[in-house]
Amino acid sequence: VSLPHAEKGTHMSRFMTFLNEKNQLLRLDTVHMALEQLVHTMESEKVFLDMEFPVFLKRHAPVTGIEGLLDFNCVLRAMFTRDGQRDTLVGVRANVTSCCPCSKEISQYGAHNQRSEVSISVRPQEHVWFEDLIDIAEKSASSRLYPILKRADEKNVTEHAYDNPK
């Protein structure tokens, strides 16, 4: 929270009371409502929220179907002012596989693959799901990552990446 110049600190117990009262899904509308309430509860001109957290999603290997959990880094940053201004940033970081197009073009026997990180940040006007941003990140790569792969899966992932150099 922002503090008036005459204040030396904030009312920390109000934060804990406020957080204990908020047991809601993490959605833009609930975040905005919570920040609007917090700016008044804390008697502040401006409040900020800055969160980074992992989200674990189930992934099935492409051939064997073996299931595993894969982690993605999610970001939520928001600001709300007493006069109603707000700014929100939602983002994800997803690890993917990329096959080098140049390497594929100049090589007769294959191409090199790399693990890459795709970062997406948006300032949404309405609710956006982290899973949708993760899907966009994975589709922008040669291949998504899988937590568990057997030989048949490895072959599939390698060939898929080779057919989709990015």
Predicted regions span which residues?
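N-terminal intrinsically disordered, cationic/polar leader segments
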Residues: V1-K166
